[in-house]
């Protein structure tokens, strides 16, 4: 015995032996193991650690699935509409807080049947969720929408399934948005534009001007039908014209046109509708600069087929010419046809290719705005080069009353209602103080669309003016707006008017806010630091309503209202 005590380091005293035993039991050295029924013998017990069996959970779920398929030990029936599902209450309560709360609130004798609202949770969706509870995998089938699974999971408070379904729906929405964007981009690239012109006698050859640009969006338009068929040389394939939809300044070479036709000028304009129109060469004098002339063989055109209509008052300015309004269309249908004018000699007949650069209307200031033309008429020389021999229009800052847009009604026109001009070449009010060339051929109804509201849409004096329609709609592009004032501001996009001009550098802008920012940035005007609106800001910028315009009449009668038509002139000290 003493040998055993000395072996374990314990004295023969029983009291000290018990103290040693207690110290060993308090520590993690080992366990007490009695020998021969005594409490004095100790031996350390080795620790084996935790042994894991990863297959246990899978085997448990597989066993539960087999029990559910056989109906073994199933103690609950879930009713979804008329469909019954056998399950185990323990599994349902473990996977869904909905069932856990349901079984806690119900008595033991009322837990056998659970009825779920079938208008929120569908039977196929609940079947998928029940399979997930027993398998740990969610399998989405084509006959069950993801939205139904999301609704069922939300009803049963299965948050993991809700997150997965939401991510799937968001990914699908992004994919649909991308496909829709690609489809819109594809639809925006229309076929190339083709315009047919005809003469008033004999067979009518086709005029087809083509541009070799393959990557631009193109659309196909045809003019008014001619009574005679189109004639084309048998050895030459038909030629189509491409629309110039690039930014202004992009030049494209046009091939020669071999089909016989009367002398016309092919004018490519970067219009708001991104189309190419063909207008007669008689619109321009022979002294036009910056155009490429391509002589063609002389054509036999009788002078009796052409005529010129001169304005009634050659000396006075032509008030705004806007044809009467007609049914709104999505885009104007430009038509090309020979317009009557003085017939040139057959030896002088030639084709003129004219590239007119349009203004890019933007709220941002550009550094090259001084070099760009301020309108379609800036591309031609003054002194009667366009629309007759009237003198050019004076600049806006020299005479505030000589420029700007005026709103006119259907009865305020001076020429017949069938002018055959491309839509965006129709002279706006006060734009061209020159003679207008008209055509004996009828023009389509889309050419009579006014850019601004006509008189029948104007409201009483003192108001902004409202539409007789339910929603204010642009007659040119079909866009709708919340109020008529916003529509009037939008109209400058189509007219390409820049009525606000800087009195320092003479740059023009579409909106008054753009001019204000330009002066504050470029000319160090400390206008932005004023805490309150300054009534002198308007006179400082030289913004005055056009005398005699409906805007001036409304402001004079009502004493207020946002401005609509302006002519920007420098401030004068009186």
UniProtKB/Swiss-Prot annotation:
User: What InterPro entries does this protein map onto?
Assistant: BTB/POZ_dom, SKP1/BTB/POZ_sf, Znf_C2H2_sf, Znf_C2H2_type, ZnFinger_BTB_dom_contain
Q: Which domain of life is it from?
A: Eukaryota
Zn-finger region bounds: C2H2-type: 472-494, 500-523
Localization per Swiss-Prot or TrEMBL = Nucleus
Q: Which Pfam families match?
A: BTB, zf-C2H2
Query: Position of cross-link Glycyl lysine isopeptide (Lys-Gly) (interchain with G-Cter in SUMO2)?
Result: 181-182, 532
Q: Which GO terms describe its molecular function?
A: DNA binding; DNA-binding transcription factor activity, RNA polymerase II-specific; zinc ion binding
One biological process term from GO is:
regulation of transcription by RNA polymerase II
Compositional bias of type Polar residues: which residue ranges? Answer: 187-212
Record-listed Phosphoserine modification sites: 362, 549
For bias type Basic and acidic residues, the affected ranges are: 526-535
SMART domains named among the record's database cross-references:
BTB, ZnF_C2H2
Occurrences of domain BTB (ranges): 74-142
List, alphabetically, the PANTHER family matched: AGAP004733-PA, ZINC FINGER AND BTB DOMAIN-CONTAINING PROTEIN 44 ISOFORM X1
Tell me, in a sentence or two, what this protein's role is. Answer: May be involved in transcriptional regulation.
Q: What is this protein called?
A: Zinc finger and BTB domain-containing protein 3
């Amino acid at each position: 015995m003493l040998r055993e005590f000395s072996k374990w380091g314990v004295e023969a005293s029983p009291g000290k032996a018990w103290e040693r035993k207690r110290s060993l039991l308090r520590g993690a050295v080992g366990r007490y193991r009695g020998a021969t029924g005594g409490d004095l013998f100790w031996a350390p017990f080795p620790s084996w650690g935790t042994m894991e069996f990863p297959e246990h959970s899978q085997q448990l779920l597989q066993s539960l699935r087999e029990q559910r398929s056989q109906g073994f030990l199933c103690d609950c029936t879930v009713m979804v509409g008329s469909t019954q599902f056998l399950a185990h209450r323990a599994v349902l309560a473990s996977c869904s807080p909905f069932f856990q709360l349901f079984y806690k609130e119900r008595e033991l004798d009322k837990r056998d049947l659970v009825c779920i609202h079938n208008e929120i949770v569908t039977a196929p969706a609940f079947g998928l969720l029940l399979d997930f509870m027993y398998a740990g995998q969610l399998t989405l089938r084509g006959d069950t929408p993801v939205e139904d699974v999301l609704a069922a999971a939300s009803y049963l408070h299965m948050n993991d399934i809700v997150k997965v379904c939401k991510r799937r729906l968001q990914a699908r929405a992004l994919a649909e948005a991308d496909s829709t964007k690609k489809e819109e981009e594809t639809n925006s690239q229309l076929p190339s534009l083709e315009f047919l012109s005809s003469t008033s006698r004999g067979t009518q050859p086709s005029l087809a001007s083509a541009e070799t640009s393959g990557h631009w969006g193109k659309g196909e338009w045809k003019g008014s039908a001619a009574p005679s068929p189109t004639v084309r040389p048998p050895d030459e394939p038909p030629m189509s014209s491409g629309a110039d939809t690039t930014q202004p300044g992009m030049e494209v070479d046009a091939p020669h046109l071999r089909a016989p036709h009367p002398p016309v000028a092919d004018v490519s304009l970067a219009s708001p509708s991104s189309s190419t129109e063909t207008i007669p060469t008689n619109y321009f004098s022979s002294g036009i600069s910056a155009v490429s002339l391509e002589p063609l063989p002389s054509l036999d055109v009788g002078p009796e087929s052409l005529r010129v209509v001169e304005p009634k008052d050659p000396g006075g300015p032509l008030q705004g010419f806007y044809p009467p309004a007609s049914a709104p269309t999505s885009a104007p249908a430009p038509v090309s046809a020979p317009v009557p004018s003085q017939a040139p000699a057959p030896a002088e007949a030639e084709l003129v290719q004219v590239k007119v650069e349009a203004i890019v209307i933007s709220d941002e200031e550009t550094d090259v705005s001084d070099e760009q033309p301020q309108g379609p008429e800036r591309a031609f020389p003054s002194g009667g080069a366009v629309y007759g021999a009237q003198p050019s229009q004076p600049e806006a800052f020299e005479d505030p009353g000589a420029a700007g847009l005026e709103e006119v009604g259907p009865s305020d026109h001076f020429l017949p209602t069938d002018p055959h001009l491309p839509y965006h070449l129709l002279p706006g009010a006060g734009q061209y103080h020159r003679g207008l060339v008209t055509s004996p051929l009828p023009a389509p109804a889309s050419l009579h669309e006014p850019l601004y509201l006509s008189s029948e849409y104007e409201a009483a004096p003192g108001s902004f003016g409202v539409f007789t329609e339910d929603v204010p709609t642009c007659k040119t592009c079909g866009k709708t707006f919340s109020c008529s004032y916003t529509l009037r501001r939008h109209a400058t996009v189509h007219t390409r008017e820049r009525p606000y001009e800087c009195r320092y550098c003479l740059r023009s802008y579409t909106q008054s806010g753009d001019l204000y920012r330009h002066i504050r940035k470029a000319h160090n005007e400390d206008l932005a630091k004023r805490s309150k609106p300054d009534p002198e800001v308007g006179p400082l910028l030289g913004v005055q309503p056009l005398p005699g315009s409906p805007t001036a009449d409304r402001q004079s009668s009502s004493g207020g209202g946002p401005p609509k038509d302006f002519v920007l002139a420098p401030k004068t000290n009186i």
